Structure formats: structure tokens, C-alpha cells
Amino acid sequence: MQDLSPREYDAILRSDFGYFAQRCFCELNPQAAFAPNWHIEVIAAKLAAVRQGKIRRLIINLPPRHLKSLLASIAFPAWCLGHDPSAQILCVSYAQDLADKLARDCRSIMIRPWYRRLFLTRLAPHRHAVQEFITTRQGYRSPPRPAGC
């Protein structure tokens, strides 16, 4: 990827979720080296198939520290909203602190200059809730709403 022009690199990030996720990892963990592995490629391919509508249900079951959260709760919502600013994405977590961190990390990706160069998607300026953010096209990444009477 060293001989690519910036336009070519951007096109790859737009079209290949695996490379996009790797860029997200590097942005969020500048002190760590990304270690490519087959399981990351498989998850990235399955998530890309979800976005394309080829897979309707997907469970990712791996031990901790295998990039599940980065791939499925940070990079994937950002990539989907980049391609479809009206997409409606629910992100669920077992803990509030983790849910807040994942939402902040996803938002931080979406406001970076390189993301804004890749996609036309913009976050609505009037929404500043930690976990929920809305695009200017009414798409969102949000926790599920509790059901009530």
C-alpha cells in the first residue's frame, strides 16, 4: 500500500471494510502496532456481507482482546453510516461504561478529517449525547430504547 496515491488509498478505505477497520485501530491506538490475523479478515468479510444484505444475522464469538468491539461496535457503524447516512444502527453492550467508550470512539472516528474526506456523512451538530448520535440525514448509532408502558 506504500505506492498508492492518496486517492487510491481513500478508495480502498471506502470499499474494503478490513482496511477501514485497520485504519480505525491505528487512529484509536497510535502507540500499538496492528497485528493482522485471519480472524480479523473473516470478521471483516462477514460484517461487509451484513452491510451488503447477504447476511441477516451474525454472532461473533471470540475471547476478549480479539478486536470484536473495535470491528463491530466502532468501525462497522462508522463505515455503514459513511456509506448510508440514513442507516439506523443499534449497539448493545453489557456495561454502560463500555457502551459509552465505544460510542465515543465511533464518534471520534467519524469527525476525523480522513473520515470526512472519505464520506459525505456528517453528524448533526445539535446532538451531543454520549451514546447516541445522529447524522444530518437522520441516520444514527444508538443504544436500544427501553420498552415501557
Model-flagged regions — what are they?
Residues 44-48, 70-82:
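Contiguous, well-ordered alpha-helical segments that form the cores/surfaces of helical PPI scaffolds
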Residues 66-72, 82-88, 93:
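Alpha-helix boundary/capping segments in eukaryotic regulatory proteins
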Residues 1-55:
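N-terminal accessory segments
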Residues 54-77:
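Walker A/P-loop
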Residues 50-56, 82-87:
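Short, solvent-exposed loop/edge-beta patches enriched in aromatic
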Residues 57-59, 88-90, 140:
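Residue-level preference for the first positions of well-ordered beta-strands
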Residues 79-88, 111-115:
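Post-Walker A helix-loop "phosphate-sensing" segment adjacent to the P-loop in P-loop NTPases
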Residues 92-147:
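Conserved nucleotide-state-sensing and coupling region of NTP-binding domains
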